[in-house]
Swiss-Prot record:
UniProt pathway annotation: Cofactor biosynthesis; NAD(+) biosynthesis; NAD(+) from deamido-NAD(+) (L-Gln route): step 1/1
Role played: Catalyzes the final step of the nicotinamide adenine dinucleotide (NAD) de novo synthesis pathway, the ATP-dependent amidation of deamido-NAD using L-glutamine as a nitrogen source.
Protein name: Glutamine-dependent NAD(+) synthetase
Gene Ontology cellular component annotations, sorted alphabetically: cytoplasm
Gene: Nadsyn1
Amino acid sequence: MGRKVTVATCALNQWALDFEGNFQRILKSIQIAKGKGARYRLGPELEICGYGCWDHYHESDTLLHSLQVLAALLDAPATQDIICDVGMPIMHRNVRYNCLVIFLNRKILLIRPKMALANEGNYRELRWFTPWARSRQTEEYVLPRMLQDLTKQETVPFGDVVLATQDTCIGSEICEELWTPCSPHVNMGLDGVEIITNASGSHHVLRKAHTRVDLVTMATSKNGGIYLLANQKGCDGHLLYYDGCAMIAMNGSIFAQGTQFSLDDVEVLTATLDLEDVRSYRAKISSRNLEATRVNPYPRVTVDFALSVSEDLLEPVSEPVEWTYHRPEEEISLGPACWLWDFLRRNNQAGFFLPLSGGVDSAASACVVYSMCCLVCEAVKSGNQQVLTDVQNLVDESSYTPQDPRELCGRLLTTCYMASENSSQETHNRATELAQQIGSYHISLNIDPAVKAILGIFSLVTGKFPRFSAHGGSSRENLALQNVQARIRMVLAYLFAQLSLWSRGARGSLLVLGSANVDESLLGYLTKYDCSSADINPIGGISKTDLRAFVQLCAERFQLPVLQAILSAPATAELEPLADGQVSQMDEEDMGMTYTELSIFGRLRKVAKAGPYSMFCKLLNMWKDSCTPRQVAEKVKRFFSKYSINRHKMTTLTPAYHAENYSPDDNRFDLRPFLYNTRWPWQFLCIDNQVVQLERKTSQTLEEQIQEHFKEPSPIWKQLLPKDP
């Protein structure tokens, strides 16, 4: 009896609605899997159309073209003699489902609809699909005529069903189902399913890989079995980067690990595993076997096909591997760089334009581009023909082969230091040195003539000329003068992005990169329509703390010594007059809180779902050794006041790489109003009452505290009622 099976899973860089490209990548993955001896190939969730189609799922065209690609795959010689598992949307009885279609030798074996839809964070699957709610039940799906003519089948099983081959049994999960409390793999495993597959569309978040790996290893540790996970990779047209991490596990151990970040459009993993190892592993777990006797059976579709070969005694089996994780700063170096590469090559632009201020944030964006150039050179050196073709198209030179990241960076990145009378020589020097060290084409200019022209128009109309606070002006004048400088820089950035290559006799235009980090966006510490307004922002979902660690990594890994000077310099916007030639404006002083505090506020607000009062209560304990209750209250109230005043800025935020679960992205991740009562009277009164009670307790005797404890408190609503005249 054959026992050893070779199975394949993959990570594909699919692109929403790119049916031709998606078809070719699926076909290539099947060819590679067959070439490695696999007899089962698993692909990512919705791989035929690309996961990120969003409201295009409502269009009949998306369903039609997906069926056409399925027909092309069924008819392709490469898909013969291997069980293929592909993801696509399907309409059954006028209901749209997110499905896996499993086929072999021009016959569709079954269609498995998704049963638990992802509907939190960036996911909106319930907007487009309906979950299959009939556990362990199937219906007959009537095939469209184009598939009937090809397969000679009229109907196929549709529902919660497993596949029985001659030698084993295979069950399917789809992405979110692995993450649910009652995952299907549990009962499937108890019912004798030995191979579980999971087609995923799982995007990158810093530190998320640990959770994904833990879920897979735990699934096979408690119940035994083989587990295959496929995932999409790359930017498929939105803010998300799908980070691969395809894997094959058995009995709690990993046997094949895919890359998390790479420029390869097609990556196929295979492993040869012994089914008897699954059976003996399960046999020793008596509690599992007792539960198995009580489980309701799954309907089975049988197929006259085996994953193993009859004479496999000399076939070597795969060995367990230790999963290699990236540190968060390495994830920042790789994830946004791969995302930028996909965005650039698919956007038909000729490179990037980045306003370089000499500070940490814009330096981090520059380092992401430089990291991208390093990845491109490495991919070309390793023989990736697709990357070579893409870079040749970008530079408009068919014979070009990139070898040096600095030289490539000079072709793809234009940086610009936009000085004003409030800029220091130190930031100018740091920006210039960084541009030299990464090799970007660098421009230095002065915005003062444009600022004076704008203010001249205002003065001509009103007869007034605003002044900075340092020169006796009001806070309104001071803020307006800062914003004029910031917005002029945005206008100039787009002008130079459109015409700088034209001025140098080169073709094309540039994408403008932004550099606002997630903490400053959360607080609104940016000017609306300044250089935070760009085409895309590679660091917009990353905290200042993580960015500093990333820049430190780049200083060491890429040998960029100027980054040490940038890290040690105080963070400043340089929008107010210098004091004796020195910077007088500091970011953390302007904000009234530190970046570390901002990160904590951000996680509590979004991840812990804390409003003002809940946040105050949590921070009382977290900060009890460094802050009094009154100080905690003031910090919380200051944060929520500024956050709510500036929330409107999030509605126009530049599309940014999603990296943190506390992102304030208003587009689809953090859906909240942008018109608040910024005084928060009820919430802040609750906080103030608690502060008063806590301060009173510290000054009371034990007897007074006991009396206070049994005293009837005054309801907060009474304190908010208008007082009698």
